[in-house]
Amino acid sequence: MFNFGKSVNRILIPDLSEQAVLSSVVDAGQNYLAQKNYDMMESLDFYYNQNLDKHIEQWFASESLSQVPPFIGSCVPRFAKARMMIYKENAKRLIAGEVNDDYNQLTYRINTKTREFSELAWLLGCCYMKSMYNERKNRLEYEILPNVQEYYVRGETEPFAYSYEIENVDPTKKRFVFWSEERDGVQGMHFEYDEKGYRFAVKENSEMINPYGIVPISKVAFSKASYDVTRAGLHIAIAMTEIALSVRFRLGQPVFTGLEEGQSKLSAGIDNAYILPEGATFNYVAPGGSLIELIEATKSMANQVAENNQLRIRWGESGGNAPSGEALRIMEIENLEARKSDEAIFREFEHDRYEIDRRILEVHNILTLSEEYAVDFGEVTFPMSPKEEREMLSWKLDNNIISQKDLLLYYNPDMSEEELEMKMSGIMQENQTVANSQQPQSSFQRILNGASPTSS
C-alpha cells in the first residue's frame, strides 16, 4: 500500500465506538516510541538552536572536537523567517466587519504565536496549535504542538480525534493527551493516558468528556516539509567546524623525524632549544587547501538551498549601493508569489482557530462572538525614499484609501485612543481656522472684524 504524502501519525479506526477508540489509543501510545520522527526533532533543534552539539559531534572523531567546539549557526530560523512573510506584519482580524477590542484583549500573544507557528509549519510540513482558556489569568492562550497523532474513521478524510505527548514528572514514563469531537451522536472524549493505555481524568473532568464538543486544535499542512533547509544547516555547521579546525591547524603540527623511541615527547616553547641527533629533522606541517575555497563551497550550499525555497542571500561582503525598494521587490518576486499561495492555507487556519476560540469563550461564559470572521494579512513593504513615501501617502489620502487617523497611526502605531482623539481634534480646528480665513466675508462681517467696508 503506497502512502502518498500521508503522515505516519495517521491512525485508522473501524468505527466511533468507545471500545474501538480506546483500543486505538493503546496502539498509539506504543507507536509513539516506534514512530518517533528523528527528522522532525532535528528540525526543531535547529530552529530553536538547542541540542545542536549532538547533531554535529557524531560526524567527527572525538579527538577532533577537543581542538575546537562545534560551529553553531542560525541559518535555519533565518530561512524560516525570510520564507514565511505571511505574519511579518500583524494580521488584522475582523469580527462582523470590525475590530473587536474585547476579543483582541483576550487573545494573549496571538501575533507572536502565529508567526512562530507559520515558520514551524513550513519547516516541518505540518504543525498544530491548541487554543485554551486560562481561568486564572482570564485570557485565551495558544500552544504549538509539532507532533500530533490524528485519528480517522475508515473511509473519512477529516480526523475526529487528536493525541499528543505532554511533559511528565517521571521522564521515563510517557504521558499523552487525547481529544475527540462530538460526532454522529457520540459524545467527545478528553483524558490523559500512558503507554499502556491507562486513562487519567484531566482536573475535575472525572467523566472524561470533551466540554467543548469540538477538538480545540487547529492545523496547517503543506504539501512537503522543508527538511532540505535543516539538512543544509547541518552541512554548513559541519563545514564551518572543519574550517575552524583548519584555522586552528594553520599554525602547523610540529613533526620530528629520526628520533629514537622515548624521545617523542618534548616541551615546546620559544625558550626551549632542541638538540637533534644526526639525521633527525623538525618542522611544522600545515593542512593543505585554501580557506577561501572552503568558505565559497560552504556558501554555495546555502545559496542552492535558498534558491530552491524562493529565497536569496545577500552576503555581508557584497559590494555596491543598497538596492532600492522596487529593486528589492523584483528580487523577491518568487517569494512574494509563494506568499500569495500561503494566504489561502493560513486563511483557512485562521477561520478554524477562530471557531475554536469562539466555542471556548461561549462554554466559559466569557464572550459571545459573531460567526462572521475575516482576516486581512498585512502587505509586505519595502523601503522607500522619503519622497516616494510622501507621494504614496499623499495619493492614498487624496483617493480616500486612508484617513487622517490612519496617517497618524502610520507614523505612530503605539498612539493611544486619547492621544489620537486630541490630535484629530487639533487638526480639525486648524483646518476650520484655515477655511474661515480663506472664505469671502460680507461687509457686515468685515465691520465686526474691525475693517472698513469697501465700495462696490
PLM region spans:
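Extended, compositionally biased alpha-helical segments that mediate assembly or anchoring
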Residues: 422-456
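Short, basic interhelical loop/turn and adjoining N-cap
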Residues: 412-421
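Extended, non-catalytic structural segments that build the interaction scaffolds
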Residues: 42, 51-62, 274-308, 325-348, ...
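Extended, regular secondary-structure scaffolds
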Residues: 119-123, 128-219
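Extended, charged amphipathic alpha-helical segments
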Residues: 200-334, 364-367, 384
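Amphipathic alpha-helical protein-protein interaction segments
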Residues: 125-130, 308, 406-410
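Substrate-recognition/cap regions that form aromatic- and gly/pro-loop-enriched pockets
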Residues: 355-366
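Extended, helix-rich architectural segments
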Residues: 1-140, 452-456
